[in-house]
């Protein structure tokens, strides 16, 4: 597998093995063996390892942020925040090692004592996306490890270098062999093998709704515990009495932060008709000043799309928007001029005259595209906001 810089596709960041079923078998066997002893380590002692991970992450924060920016493309300010979330998660999870409380409950019988005790589940497969390559693996792995589980991380192939560096930091913290494992590969091979493996007890997945549906159905058939975080079509409502400057800040960051490549991105702006024209002008002016560029360029506001496939997906939705009758106020095209010629860049885009039934108002685009929908009342705005096929709001 090749990991390339999305701001300059000619640059190979790293190469990694394309793990197959036998590699997954090896990782699961390693995690299963380690689980037998790791689960007996007292929770406060397990938490000390995770606290050390947080300390090492703090020492390597800038190095990791630079790697995220180079491999995934997000601006350095965002990349530093990505690492900081991992650091915060480490220290929080470590604190929970002394708070894994159970419960005592009254018994109907005088010679009985009733209580609950938290017990680890077993081997956990963690399948993570590329948009938060440090934060999301940390969210998943750290609580699981403190609770006495062992884990296998299968990151998105676009951010293999970030995942490798993160696992090296876990190793530096002294975790016993087999407690945390890394499997590179594509979803249809390594990911599928993990989800279907009989010795995996829990699957935690963050990614597309289509893949998540497969993961959920498979875990249902095999009686695995499962946690799914999938797509969203999130909206921001701006009413006639809103603080428009405050709303504008939220709209620009929500729509174009991380190049719109977040399941929580603001892809719909629901605007009251009394302020729509004024707010649209404000949004246009702010959007026109946003600068495209490589993530490690300090002048960059919006980085590249992750890869060619996703770039073409965003472009396809702009064709759909035009066919459905939406008006492109700004952007709407692949950007390839000058220093952007070797990257996967898409212009920040505002779509006007969007109605709630259009595909661009209902389907996740995962790019720097925001759709404007006009309403005449708060009740209408709420109804449109809630009319979504996705679980995230």
Predicted regions and their residues:
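Short acidic active-site motifs
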Residues: 23, 189-190, 380
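Glycine-rich loop-to-alpha-helix module at the N-terminal edge of alpha/beta enzyme cores
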Residues: 4, 8-100, 111
């Amino acid at each position: 597998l090749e990991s390339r810089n999305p701001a300059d596709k000619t640059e190979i960041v790293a190469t990694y093995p394309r793990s197959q079923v036998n590699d997954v078998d090896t990782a699961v066997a390693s995690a299963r063996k380690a689980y037998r002893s790791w689960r007996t380590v007292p929770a406060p002692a397990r938490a000390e390892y995770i606290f050390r991970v947080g300390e090492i992450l703090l020492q390597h924060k800038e190095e990791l942020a630079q790697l995220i920016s180079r491999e995934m493309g997000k601006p350095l300010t965002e990349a530093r925040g990505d690492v900081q979330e991992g650091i915060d998660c480490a220290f929080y999870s470590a604190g929970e090692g002394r708070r894994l409380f159970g419960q005592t409950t009254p018994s109907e019988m005088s010679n009985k004592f009733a209580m609950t005790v938290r017990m680890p589940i077993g081997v956990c497969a963690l399948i993570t996306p590329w948009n938060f390559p440090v934060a999301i693996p940390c969210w998943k792995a750290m609580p699981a490890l403190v609770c006495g589980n062992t884990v296998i991380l299968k990151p998105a192939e676009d951010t293999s270098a970030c995942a490798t560096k993160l696992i090296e930091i876990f190793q530096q913290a002294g975790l016993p062999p087999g407690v945390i494992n890394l499997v590179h590969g594509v979803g249809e091979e390594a990911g599928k093998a993990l989800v279907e493996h009989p010795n995996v007890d829990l699957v935690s997945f963050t990614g597309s709704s289509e893949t998540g549906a497969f993961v959920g159905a498979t875990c249902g058939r095999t009686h695995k515990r499962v946690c799914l975080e999938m797509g969203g079509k999130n909206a921001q409502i701006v009413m006639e009495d809103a603080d428009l400057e405050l709303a504008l800040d939220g709209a620009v960051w929500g729509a174009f932060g991380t190049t719109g490549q977040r399941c929580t991105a603001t892809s719909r702006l629901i605007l009251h008709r009394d302020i729509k024209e004024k707010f649209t002008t404000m949004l246009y002016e702010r959007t026109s000043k946003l600068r495209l560029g490589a993530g490690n360029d300090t002048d960059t506001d919006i980085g590249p799309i992750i890869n060619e496939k996703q770039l073409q997906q965003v472009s396809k939705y702009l064709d759909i928007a035009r066919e459905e009758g939406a008006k492109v106020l700004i952007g709407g095209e692949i950007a390839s001029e000058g220093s952007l010629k070797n990257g996967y860049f898409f212009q920040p885009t505002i779509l006007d005259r969007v109605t709630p039934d259009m595909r661009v108002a209902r389907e996740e685009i995962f790019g720097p595209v925001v759709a404007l929908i006009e309403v005449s009342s708060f009740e209408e705005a709420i109804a449109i906001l809630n009319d979504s096929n996705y679980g995230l709001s």
